[in-house]
Regions:
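ABC-type ATPase nucleotide-binding domains, specifically the catalytic core motifs of the NBD
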Residues: 16-21, 62-65, 77-119, 146-163, ...
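A short, proline-enriched helix->beta-strand linker immediately N-terminal to the Walker B motif
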Residues: 206-210
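Conserved ABC ATPase "signature" region
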Residues: 163-182, 291-295
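P-loop NTP-binding/switch modules centered on Walker-like glycine-rich loops
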Residues: 221-305
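Catalytic Walker B motif of ABC-type/P-loop ATPase nucleotide-binding domains
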Residues: 212-215
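Charged, flexible cofactor/metal-binding loops and thiol motifs
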Residues: 81-85, 98-105, 275-370
């Protein structure tokens, strides 16, 4: 029997407004995900697929209007299970015509007050986040040690400055920062990108959160440092058993760290299942988009043959003009005459094709059992 999820996202919708185009962008459009205690769920997809916006929505960090306009984000915290979007729907009203959003009326001030009340004691304490650019996430005017001490004193039972300092040094040591007592007094500008990312990881885990969100934690680092950060995250997962939501466009990172995977395209989840099953080379059932992503990744075989990588034809879906049918239809190379009408005119449900494996595609008849 599967454990009750620590994080359950249901029908999440997060939209933004484009002033140049005078239209709403459906960045996250009906996403449902769950993460079990101790599990790492990897979310993968091209830039613009909605991965990071999903993560930021879960952490309550979407600030641009209209932002999160609907859904449920349930977190099983140390105290109780709570819906982090509870009651927010009364502050939002969406108007649509012919499948296109014409207006979003939102009491932004009331929404923010309610959202901050819901996130009180959650952000930082129950949910911690590693950002893709550690230099911009760290305070440039404060030492690494001071930022760690502040986090520890705010979110843990540490008694006094001295105990918080020792805990901070302990975490710098755990993330493999050399000479942690000396680095404690360093400012971010005096540390490399990889070292800043290690400090960010230490800061996130020092509060002993229930859920860690890692948003592109290796982006912007050179290949050697990327590998070391991935090794570090893998080791910390073993040591702490932390539940993790991992965002990446790098499938090799997902393969290394994730227990389950969710593939996103055009603001929706198109495939989800155990990582070993979804990413297996011999997989018989796979969403065409997942297959295209895997085909674009270099392998020892393609390197040996010096063959070209397979690019995904076309452009990433513009989620302003969402098609009536499958969102990948315009780029899909597996459409047959038998399913073309469905692909063009009806969005497929996310249906179970095997135990724990779901695919949003008309190629698989089992999709009808969503």
């Amino acid at each position: 029997m599967m454990d009750a999820p620590l994080l359950a996202i249901e029908n999440l919708r997060t939209y933004f407004y484009s002033r140049p185009k005078r239209a709403f962008i459906r960045s996250v459009d009906g996403v449902s995900l769950h993460v079990a205690p101790g599990e790492t769920l990897g979310i993968v997809g091209e830039s613009g697929s909605g991965k990071s916006v999903t993560a930021l929505s879960a952490a309550g960090l979407v600030s641009a209007a209209p932002g999160v306009i609907g859904g449920r984000i349930e977190l099983r915290s140390r105290q109780a299970r709570r819906n982090l979007l509870d009651g927010l729907e009364r502050y939002v009203r969406v108007k649509e015509r012919d499948g296109r959003i014409t207006a979003v009326e939102k009491d932004d001030r009331g929404w923010r007050r309610r959202a901050e009340t819901l996130m009180e004691g959650v952000r930082g304490k129950e949910i911690a986040m590693i950002f893709q650019n550690p230099r911009s996430a760290l305070n440039p005017y404060s030492t690494i040690g001071a930022q760690l001490v502040e986090t520890i004193r705010l979110h843990t039972s540490a008694k006094g400055e001295g105990e918080a300092r020792e805990r901070a040094i302990h975490w710098l040591e755990r993330v493999r920062i050399d000479s942690p007592r000396l680095r404690f007094d360093n400012f971010p500008f005096g540390m490399s990108g990889g070292m800043c990312q290690r400090a960010m990881i230490a800061m996130a885990l020092s509060a002993e959160p229930s859920l860690l969100i890692a948003d592109e934690p290796t982006t912007g680092l050179d290949a050697t440092i990327q590998s070391r950060i991935v090794d570090l995250l893998a080791q910390l997962k073993i040591e702490t058993g932390i539940t993790t939501l991992l965002i990446s466009h790098d499938i090799s990172v997902i393969q290394r760290l994730a227990d389950r995977i969710a593939v996103m395209y055009g603001g929706t989840v198109v495939e989800t299942g155990r990582a070993a099953e979804v990413l297996a080379p011999q997989a018989q059932v796979r969403h065409p988009y997942t297959a295209a992503l895997l085909a674009s990744v270099p392998s020892p075989e393609t390197i040996r043959r010096k063959s070209y990588l397979q690019a995904i034809e076309g452009e990433v879906l513009d989620t302003i003009e969402v098609p009536r049918g499958c969102r990948f239809y315009g780029r899909c190379n597996r459409v047959t005459e038998a399913i073309r009408e469905n692909c063009a005119g009806r969005e497929p449900p996310l249906g179970e094709v095997a135990t724990g494996h779901k695919v949003r595609c008309w190629l698989y008849p089992a999709t009808g059992k969503a």
